[in-house]
Amino acid sequence: MYAYFRGELISSSRDNAIVDVGGVAYRLLISNSTYRQLPSSGDQVKLLAHLHVKEDLMQLYGFIEEEERQLFLLLLSISGVGPKLALAILSGLPVEEIQEAIMANKPETLFGISGVGKKTAARIILELRDRILKLQQTRPGKTAGAGSVASLSEDALQALMTLGFSRASAQQAVTRALLSAENPGVEDIVREALQNIRNH
């Protein structure tokens, strides 16, 4: 539903930020990493967003960097890891250290984070190692099929928007598609993204 919020930063703390967008104030839960990168209150800010919906509860999560949002979504895909724990993990360590721990098979790094036990740490590594590797291989500046992931992503976004999907829903579907498509081209990403949209 929401891709990002751009507006005046009204206030922030270690776990949330309030952004005024056109006279409407939005409260987004954030990690320590995002908090440390926020500007001063009164300045303009852009926060990438994820709307988490569960039963009758809707909560917005905000991220300064796309890499952090992608890792948040990956963590949510793991059974037993909800948004609260995913945000705690992102607050416990920088994104790079979390990825390194997963790639190097070091669960002890993760279960040092509050709320992460040995079983959860092992599950995170087991389920995310290959997906993190694929994500790193398809970052901007590296080739993925016929072009960089940034170019592929934008082309796929435009294709989905032409089909009538909002940019926000298309963005989330494309992000998931990039993580699961093998040697993705634009057609592969669009096909996978459409499947993701139908399943959500």
UniProtKB/Swiss-Prot annotation:
Keywords: Cytoplasm, DNA damage, DNA recombination, DNA repair, DNA-binding. NCBIfam families: ruvA. This is Holliday junction branch migration complex subunit RuvA. The lineage of its organism: Bacteria, Pseudomonadati, Chlorobiota, Chlorobiia, Chlorobiales. Residues 65-143 are annotated as: Domain II. Transmembrane segments: none annotated. Signal peptide: none annotated. The RuvA-RuvB-RuvC complex processes Holliday junction (HJ) DNA during genetic recombination and DNA repair, while the RuvA-RuvB complex plays an important role in the rescue of blocked DNA replication forks via replication fork reversal (RFR). RuvA specifically binds to HJ cruciform DNA, conferring on it an open structure. The RuvB hexamer acts as an ATP-dependent pump, pulling dsDNA into and through the RuvAB complex. HJ branch migration allows RuvC to scan DNA until it finds its consensus sequence, where it cleaves and resolves the cruciform DNA. Has three domains with a flexible linker between the domains II and III and assumes an 'L' shape. Domain III is highly mobile and contacts RuvB. Residues 144-154 are annotated as: Flexible linker. One of its GO terms (molecular function) is four-way junction DNA binding. One of its GO terms (biological process) is DNA repair. Its main location: cytoplasm. One of its GO terms (cellular component) is cytoplasm. HAMAP family: DNA_HJ_migration_RuvA (MF_00031). Residues 154-200 are annotated as: Domain III. It is found in: Cytoplasm. Residues 1-64 are annotated as: Domain I. The keyword Plastid does not apply. It comes from the Bacteria. Homotetramer. Forms an RuvA(8)-RuvB(12)-Holliday junction (HJ) complex. HJ DNA is sandwiched between 2 RuvA tetramers; dsDNA enters through RuvA and exits via RuvB. An RuvB hexamer assembles on each DNA strand where it exits the tetramer. Each RuvB hexamer is contacted by two RuvA subunits (via domain III) on 2 adjacent RuvB subunits; this complex drives branch migration. In the full resolvosome a probable DNA-RuvA(4)-RuvB(12)-RuvC(2) complex forms which resolves the HJ. Pfam families: HHH_5, RuvA_C, RuvA_N.
